[in-house]
């Protein structure tokens, strides 16, 4: 018989006790129902716009709902492997008789911030029940018998017709078609975390005066909500167009590394006594946007620092795009290797990004949930100011994935797949009516050709390089020959992120068109820097159609009004090296 050392015996005893406690909670505690849906026999949960007009509900649509109950579940979790909910607290527990007519929405964001961060512990989740306006008309006065009222307000202190809930008070009012014409009812609810959280969507309200709840080891949770009948401003996909001067300016935001809460700076340079990472990063971004006033902003990955976003990646995504949305600037986005390491998958993040105001983010027909093709491979053209049917430039956006899935053969980072290169090549050949003009491509992880410091056509000579080359290029070990596709598509400039302390542009001569391969340079204080001290920076591009040229320059966090490393990239006037 094998006898375990005393230390391991103790660990085994702890494990047995822990499993017994977990099983007790799982088997003995009352279970929580997850889904309460509409009775499918009711045909009027969705109606057309004419119905709303006839009822005097101008501005209403089937997207509108009435929040009629709010509650939260207490749960117990073991890592990310098991989570069981054993206790429920709700304001309208007497709604039992009307549940079959309601739809329950659970916000999968742990208010305690424990799930995903601790091996085991207690988690809490907010939920709310909604009723569609068409059902208000259908049931009429029976709603009062079912004790169905709707939420009209959320306040810090109790008011008339309000009920205490967590650290706030919720106000309920009776509902009817007539009252819907007069009162404002809350239609949808979400939660954002951190004292610096932002709600950039115009028809949503963020209650920042007081938190919904604040736990000791968690960022404060704030309610954000919208009212019925409020429509967002039309901010769908924008048509990209040159200015009257024949120019098109792009601000590239690389490696912002934002998270939930303000967080401390990492490798700040120059160093200050106190430094909050995200506020400093956001201020820098706002300054550059106000100075440059670009026609497009491109996020080139790692805008979200995954391990700082386990509580809620949506909060961080909204924080990243808020300065751009506030200035009504169209924006595109690709993902890096850290974005989906928080609470949301790449696909879930993409679903949010694709519908946000001024977003150009698109799914390709081949994008997959398992990321084998990546998520967010798309193309946009820039059109002439004189002839809106004639493009003057093309922009390609590709998902460069994360880490190699065949690490024993090709260790390190993943690569853009041959199927992705073929997709944009086929799209170019079939769907782009006009194929002339200046072209750029954006993704996160650099190509292997970023290592081509030495000339391929002139042995012993170096390729032109402008900017800072401080750290090793972490390109994938496998070469999917994307540079060949980019050359065939006549791409002039490629720009990526990933390596924070490199900000150079290299003119690679391994293909006939000699493509410029550029880094954006790390912009966020929440990511690494170092290498002797590296100040955060942002790169700007200006496509000049009249000159058939692309200019680029950069700005530093500490001196955003000054530019450096200016290049005219296609006229031969760039310095050979700096």
Curated annotation (Swiss-Prot):
The keyword Zinc does not apply. Its EC number is 3.1.-.-. ATP binds at residues 116-123. One of its GO terms (cellular component) is fungal-type vacuole. Signal peptide: none annotated. It is found in: Cytoplasm. Its main location: cytoplasm. Keywords: ATP-binding, Cell cycle, Cytoplasm, Hydrolase, Nucleotide-binding. Coiled coil: none annotated. It comes from the Eukaryota. It is an enzyme of class 3 (hydrolase). Changing residue 338 to A: 20% phosphatase activity. Pfam families: Metallophos (PF00149). The keyword Isomerase does not apply. GO terms for biological process: negative regulation of endoplasmic reticulum unfolded protein response; traversing start control point of mitotic cell cycle. Required for cell cycle progression. Has a role in the completion of START. Present with 1940 molecules/cell in log phase SD medium. This is Phosphatase DCR2.
